[in-house]
Amino acid sequence: MKLKFISMAVFSALTLGVATNASAVTTVNGGTVHFKGEVVNAACAVNTNSFDQTVNLGQVRSERLKVDGAKSNPVGFTIELNDCDSQVSAGAGIVFSGPAVTGKTDVLALQSSAAGSATNVGVQITDHTGKVVPLDGTASSTFTLTDGTNKIPFQAVYYATGQATAGIANADATFKVQYQ
């Protein structure tokens, strides 16, 4: 009986340590969470999905872009404005900016890389009226705002500035909303 009691005591002591160890909390370093945003005093707020969007222009054969002014098929994208109050502003235009192709203020230059970039091609943006949007601080055509959510449509094309050569053809533009 005494041996059984001692065996039970030893077993209990050993398993108690295991049970305690199994329930111990382990904490490791994680990372940083960046919260990004802005409080605005304007007619609308830009939807978070419109901040950093990617417009996929796809693959276009260089043969299609072999002369100055040749274009690819247009690809649509929108800039969405939320919580709009048409009493504050009746309309909005979008101002795009970015590096323009030399001599063409309405064609966005491609990002240059050491090797592998397409040449003699850029990106051109048109607004909801079909008007080409310059990159010089001029706003797109005014879009009439309604209360609530507004989706302002645009289109982008590859635009040849000469005989295009094959390669990566990425470009970046920033935008601002100009309320009118």
UniProtKB/Swiss-Prot annotation:
Function field: Fimbriae (also called pili), polar filaments radiating from the surface of the bacterium to a length of 0.5-1.5 micrometers and numbering 100-300 per cell, enable bacteria to colonize the epithelium of specific host organs.
UniProt cross-references to InterPro entries, sorted A to Z: Adhesion_dom_fimbrial, Adhesion_dom_fimbrial_sf, Adhesion_dom_sf, Bact_Fimbrial_Adh_Pro
GO cellular-component term (any): pilus
Disulfide pairings: C44-C84
SUPFAM superfamilies linked to this entry: Bacterial adhesins (SSF49401)
Biological process terms in GO annotation: cell adhesion involved in single-species biofilm formation
Official protein name in the record: Type-1 fimbrial protein, C chain
UniProt signal peptide: 1-23
Keywords: Disulfide bond, Fimbrium, Signal
Recorded family membership: Belongs to the fimbrial protein family.
Pfam families xrefs: Fimbrial
Location in the cell: Fimbrium
